[in-house]
Amino acid sequence: MNKYKRIFLVVMDSVGIGEAPDAEQFGDLGSDTIGHIAEHMNGLHMPNMVKLGLGNIREMKGISKVEKPLGYYTKMQEKSTGKDTMTGHWEIMGLYIDTPFQVFPEGFPKELLDELEEKTGRKIIGNKPASGTEILDELGQEQMETGSLIVYTSADSVLQIAAHEEVVPLDELYKICKIARELTLDEKYMVGRVIARPFVGEPGNFTRTPNRHDYALKPFGRTVMNELKDSDYDVIAIGKISDIYDGEGVTESLRTKSNMDGMDKLVDTLNMDFTGLSFLNLVDFDALFGHRRDPQGYGEALQEYDARLPEVFEKLKEDDLLLITADHGNDPVHHGTDHTREYVPLLAYSPSMKEGGQELPLRQTFADIGATVAENFGVKMPEYGTSFLNELKK
């Protein structure tokens, strides 16, 4: 008998809670995503996260301890060697990653692009982080006139290649992306995903077509999601979760346009009758505010998210469990534009916790979440991670 029929896992992308013990190795001493945002905002207003026990993990400006938190609380340390989205999420579901995925905030190394030009016979333009629509406005006409390839990246571990469908035929673009995928399996260039981004139209009026194709990396081992799916449990992936695991172990995927859309979809899944895992990633914190080093926007986004939690609490049933965490930090007042190596919060709540919650021991790996989910549903336990299921008292 499962202790909980449904587990709702929410990853607040990049919401770290202070430097990890190994932060210095990552150039991240002093990083503190929520703490610094709270200071910048002169106090964060997150009453619902506070009720769950956020301030009991650590007090910050506007975020105080409560005598009787609704849920269980602690923080988790990442065991894997990376601080990117894929590493954090794969570890949450029970894997240990010893080769970090690379991000390229300054663009890709010349050696890689030289090799790509040589193997494809086409010149490369762009080579910087950019929004897909903006880079077409900037370079689409040049791409059409020269037959070059627009190569760009984002805050995530991706290499994207855009070309006009009438200039570079789709089958050629796909071949080019396969070549890029092979080249980026090298550890020093290891990107999580290569994406073909074909477009059509005229200068000033370009549109991306549905012929996008992703060349992702599958998790290199079985995750708890695979075990759930193979045991006929539901695994509902919301936001970019399905992409992060390349669809592995996913039974249903719901796309989202924003954090608020993600919260809408979470409420939708709360209304569904299923047995298994609902897994939501809220990416805006990271993509729109962390990398752009915008503490004000980040703080406002955290408050907007918090304001949606009462809808979630209202719909949770006695045999539901809500788990809230993050996948890494991205301190918007830290130097550079990259993620930061931090502890992440962990909050666990069910309406069946009539006595409220208490502190859980510090978690030594994000995989403790995967182990807890696996134990709850009686599926094969991951190699890494220690379940805290029995520490959650009803």
From Swiss-Prot:
Chain sites annotated for binding Mn(2+) 1: D13, D327, H328
GO annotation (BP), single: metabolic compound salvage
SUPFAM superfamilies per the UniProt record, alphabetical: Alkaline phosphatase-like (SSF53649), DeoB insert domain-like (SSF143856)
Record Gene3D superfamilies: Alkaline Phosphatase, subunit A (3.40.720.10), Phosphopentomutase (3.30.70.1250)
Key words, A-Z: Cytoplasm, Isomerase, Manganese, Metal-binding
Cofactor field: Mn(2+)
Biochemical pathway: Carbohydrate degradation; 2-deoxy-D-ribose 1-phosphate degradation; D-glyceraldehyde 3-phosphate and acetaldehyde from 2-deoxy-alpha-D-ribose 1-phosphate: step 1/2
Residues annotated for Mn(2+) 2 binding in this entry: D286, H291, H339
Catalyzed chemical reaction(s): 2-deoxy-alpha-D-ribose 1-phosphate = 2-deoxy-D-ribose 5-phosphate; alpha-D-ribose 1-phosphate = D-ribose 5-phosphate
Family note: Belongs to the phosphopentomutase family.
Protein name: Phosphopentomutase
Top-level taxonomy: Bacteria, Bacillati, Bacillota, Bacilli, Bacillales
